[in-house]
Amino acid sequence: MANIENRVHWVILTLPRYRAVTPKARLVPLPAAFLDYLRSDGIILPPEDGDNPTWSDNDSGIFSGADNNDEDDEAAADPSVDWRDTHEAIERTIEELGGKVAPKLNWSAPKDATWMNATNSMECRTPNDIYLLLKSSDFVTHDLAHAFDDTADQSSEDDQEIPYHLVLRKWITLNPSVEFRCFVRDRRLIALCQRDLNHFDFLFNMQDKLRNAVQDFFELRLRNTFPDPNFTFDVYVPPPHDKVWLVDVNPWALRTDPLLFSWMELLTMDVPDVEQEETTVRLRLAQPGSSGRTGADESSGADDSEDDDIEEIWQPEFRLVRRDDPEAYGFATPQYSAHKLPKDVVDASKDGGGGMREFAQQWEEAQRLAEQQRAEDSETD
């Protein structure tokens, strides 16, 4: 489990330290007023430039429980009044990073809320795109309310002492087939696997090359520099597969998805001691055309036994999705589906600005008819 002090400062320490091997990103400090906005009920978005403050079409009052009356819409206030400097800083940062970014709070990205985005992805072009994802995400809500539930020291932490930041990364399109999740225990890379749970046949022919590239990256960049000895990290290894990029870092905790492993496996995996791993491995070298044995070797049975007893170098376990894996048939299920709303709501969100409003009206009508039917049934009884 992560240490509280390390967990608090992860985002502050890791971004500048690993800038050379991560996608371009910026940190935006978040004041208490903005955190209160994220925790508040309902999804009220600030007005776009030139617009009047109003309810977002993506919300239409559904999530706040408000009625869709014109009076309520007109009375809606700009929620960014108390954190206008932060709003403007986010606008500037988006522009600085090329107009498209992917957001993340200290420890979690709102990946479970991408269904709310018009692109069905983490790509955000405006501050309101970011706010919509953050306020719709169970992952972000957990970070705000239960950030330290899975730390080694679960003592209470004053929210005012937690330096919350919004991490905005320049949006780049990644090939999901060469994204990998890596698991570090006691500063040892013990396992890695695909992040995208689909079968990619070409990965098997280059499994050793990919593992060596990630192992070398970890030894050089992370092993002795990351503040916590136990953590997971995600990497991207694009063609020609010799350059490794650090995409994300996550806590060694149950809420981090182990993907092709289980947490019990990772916690109990047999790993050799560092001293044992660093012992000299004897290699037998042979010249072309020779048997690789000297006269002394041929006369010494003890030496023959030693040559047969060559130690193997331990390597982290690397799991890929196999074509015939029976569990792979379930991989087509959308990620984070447990965090999403019913299909009717999702479909409505894809119909443009009026889709959610129309669905809200249909929902209210269905509720009214159901209530009317219950009343009639009660009178009949």
Swiss-Prot record:
GO terms for molecular function: ATP binding; magnesium ion binding; protein folding chaperone. Residues 300-309 have a biased composition (Acidic residues). Pfam families: D123. It is found in: Cytoplasm. It comes from the Eukaryota. The keyword Transcription does not apply. This is Cell division cycle protein 123. The gene is CDC123.
